[in-house]
A protein has these predicted regions:
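Short intrinsically disordered, low-complexity coil segments enriched in acidic
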Residues: 1-6, 113, 173-175
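Negatively charged
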Residues: 169-507
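Signature of Gram-negative chaperone-usher
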Residues: 14-170
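Sec-dependent, cleavable N-terminal signal peptides
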Residues: 1-18
Length: 507
């Protein structure tokens, strides 16, 4: 019987750190030895030798770990053997018990199969991470082999190389979070005004422009830092009172906006125009009140702006009183859940491009277009409303809106439709299609003061769960055709008053 007296595996490692991030790595065993005689005398003639490697890196894009033999030779070689005895690498993935005699392989982590030993020219990627480690992080590798009685005695050795390389990383300029930006930049305007509704609320009345500077500010200027703690570059800002301009400067080509960019320009009531092309929104999750109360904002450019991760657009353009044209065709809203008050109070808006909107995840559309007084045509034919729960005031107070087609709306989850079309004075017909109202509990003032409405077919309405229909049709003074489903089961509503020019009827 052959005796393999000693098996030596010698490990070394290559560690590379790119750019400024740091990376350290270690292996808990650099010289693995196996008593071949014990393996051959065992029941299944196999053995597993686990060992750990530990990595610590602050690189934000993580690292890649690879494994290979030191040379093109992947076998464990008996250098004293005249016959060239060796333990070959397996050639395909196999479980330990299925390894051929006198072969070896490796496996990573919890894998059940062993893989062939890779040659130097074709290293195997065993792990690739996407972010920095949480302190020291360890992972396990295992060597497996199966030996046979015919193995020639001697020392069988090879060397494996574990390499750890920082993933490529591009230096970034990252803006501080929205509320912090708002507070810091707002204080640059030392002569702030105050809100008419609350004298304690500061309004940035003198900041009219926010622009990128191509040169660093002079040391004599009052300069603030507005970068996030994770930013690789400084972002400096200062205020030129004479022109009403907040300038910002960074060495990066673009500034990545913070994932929390809520309230970024909130209450910048003096802001007149904004170009977003120097900002990258790819990491933003929250844009709540982004431009809220920017009551003098007349122009904003969102061309190419990335909103793919945003979940909250609540009040994004709330009370933008003078903005007339808004093109959001570049917006990716596929992850947005909240759109309540998004355009509320845009009283001068006449053109709104929502052609790219994907609203499949939106749950709240309360006040979405409330008080958008001058727009005549609104195209929401691409809206996916299958998950919307609340549409209260959604289209209310759209004083100049002449027609509205929501026949594509899936309202099967909507619970609140109160005031939905209230004060829409110029709409003559509403196209509902087969609107599903089976979950709706309140329809109060739903069609209130739709003065021009001449015909309305709500025969598809299921009002079995409605508990409030107060003044649902109040002020619908020109209607001549109203189609109701009298068997609709308004059992939870005591009475429904319909007011028309010629009659009042209770159902």
């Amino acid at each position: 019987m052959a005796l393999a007296s000693c098996l030596n595996l010698v490990f070394s490692k290559n560690t590379f750190a790119l750019y400024t991030p740091t990376l350290s790595a270690s292996v808990n065993q650099t010289n693995l030895q196996v008593n071949g005689n014990s393996v051959i005398n065992s029941t299944d003639k196999t053995t597993e030798i686990p060992f750990n490697f530990t990595v610590n890196t602050n690189n934000r894009t993580g690292y890649t770990a690879t494994l290979s033999s030191e040379t093109e030779n992947t076998a464990l070689t008996n250098t004293s053997s005249a016959a060239g005895a060796k333990i070959d690498s397996i050639s395909t993935d196999l479980s330990l018990n299925n390894l051929p005699n006198n072969t070896w392989g490796y496996k990573f982590g919890v894998s059940t199969n062993y893989a062939p030993i890779p040659a130097l020219s074709t290293p195997a990627q065993i792990l690739q991470t996407a972010g920095k480690t949480n302190g020291n992080e360890s992972n396990q590798l295992s060597i497996g082999m199966k030996l046979a009685d015919n193995l020639e005695s001697g020392n069988y050795t090879n060397k494996l190389i574990l390499s750890f390389v920082s993933n490529p990383y591009t230096m970034r300029a990252v803006m501080t979070n929205g509320p912090d930006f708002n507070a810091r930049v707002g204080k640059l305007d030392v002569n702030t005004g105050f809100a008419s509704w609350d004298s304690s609320v500061a309004m940035m009345t003198n900041i009219r422009y926010v622009k990128k500077s191509t040169i660093r500010p002079s040391v004599s200027q009052a300069i603030i830092n507005i970068e996030d703690s994770d930013s690789d570059y400084e972002i400096l800002a200062w205020f030129d009172a004479a022109s009403g301009t907040v300038y910002y400067y960074t060495d990066a080509e673009k500034i990545e906006l913070n994932k929390n960019s809520s309230y970024l320009f909130h209450n910048f009531s003096g802001l007149q125009e904004m170009d977003m092309q120097n900002f990258d929104g790819k990491n933003i999750e929250n844009m709540r009140d982004f431009f809220a109360n920017c009551s003098n904002l007349a122009s904003v450019n969102f061309a190419g702006f990335n909103t793919g991760k945003v979940t909250d657009m609540t009040g994004m353009f709330y009370a933008n009183f003078v903005l007339k044209n808004l093109d959001l065709s570049s917006f990716d809203t596929s992850n947005v859940v909240y759109m309540n008050d998004m355009f509320s109070g845009m009283r001068e808006l006449v053109n709104l491009n929502l052609s790219s909107f994907n609203t499949g995840k939106v749950e709240i559309m309360v006040n979405m277009f409330y008080d958008v007084r001058k727009i005549k045509n609104l195209n929401v034919s691409n809206f996916d409303t299958r998950n919307v729960k609340k549409t209260r005031n959604m289209f209310a107070n759209m004083l100049e809106l002449e027609s509205l087609d929501i026949s594509n709306f899936d309202t099967s989850k909507v619970e609140d439709m109160a005031y939905m079309f209230s004060q829409d004075h110029k709409i003559k017909t509403l196209n509902f299609g087969n609107l599903n109202t089976s979950r709706v509990t309140t329809m109060e003032y739903m069609f209130q003061n739709m003065w021009a409405l001449e015909s309305l077919d709500v025969s598809s309405f299921d009002t079995s769960n409605v508990t409030n229909m107060k003044d649902m049709f109040n002020g619908v003074t020109k209607i001549t055709t109203l189609i109701l489903k009298l068997s609709c089961g308004m059992t939870k509503q005591r009475k429904l008053l319909i007011t028309t020019p010629s009659r009042e009827r209770y159902f």
